[in-house]
Amino acid sequence: MYTLTLRRFRKGDEFAVSDVICTTLAISNQADYSPEFIEENIRSHSPEVIAARAEEAHFYVALDGETIIGCGGITGYWGSKEESYLTSIFVLPDYQGKGVGRKIVETLEADEYFHRAWHTEVGSSLTAVSFYRKMGYAFKNGITDTDEYGVVRLEKRKEQ
């Protein structure tokens, strides 16, 4: 049994968050991506990159007690106030399938960046597509294949 809490990212969290992301990439994504692709992604999630990303987004961490076990952020899509983008949503493999990812997405969808936007997008790994589909995200423009960055674009639109 674990005790799940979520809170906003704090300075100093970037080291544990980087570890969560790199561990998850290395273990959970190995069935869908090449070792070279995973290694490139791990290099792009250093503590410095995470700290910068957290300054640009509303970034949250999921904790079991005091241990960071997951993370995720939401930001304006290319600076837009009408569109948002979910970023860096990861859950340690040992906690996957236990509601942590769902709670992270629900927290992001309760954030002001989600509420002000008519459209929210996420670039999903192949590994996580079914998770986002369960959370109500649809394939952007009906495209189910990965893009040039190796992700599948999904979106959620508010009824207009």
Where in this protein do the model-derived segments appear?
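Terminal substrate-recognition subdomain of acyl/acetyltransferases
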Residues: D145-Q160
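Conserved acetyl-CoA-binding loop-helix of GNAT-fold acetyltransferases
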Residues: V91, G97-A110, K134
